[in-house]
Amino acid sequence: MADNFTILVGTIGQGMNVSGDSGETWTKIRNPIPSECSIRALRTYPDDPHRILAGTDGLGLFRSDDNGLNWSGVDSPIGDLQVWSVAVDPANTDTIFAGTRPEGFRSRDGGKTWDKLSMGATLECPIGTPRTTNMVVD
């Protein structure tokens, strides 16, 4: 592992922090991701670890192309949902999956358009609320 590597930490209720010096110092990400936001999912792109997706609690997805220094919102129909999981297809990184509550969404064009996926979960659940908490693409 390199001597200086970047660490991103997503929190519940305190946004995201980034360290560019292996955890020695930290900076809070403040814009455009609110500092009180909950970050529920972080995923790097398999072909470029400097590209990162962040799933939030009610603000949709954000993307960074520079190792977490700058972020932009990803326009999608899930902007007001809790994004619990994010996956990127290693064979085609334009294909992105986002797990919400209880359904999932897929983009085949890098996040420009999205399709809702029927994954068999329903909102009716005897205990708790169903959520798509993990997604893996083979």
What residue spans do the PLM features occupy?
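Extracellular glycan-interacting surfaces
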Residues: 1-138
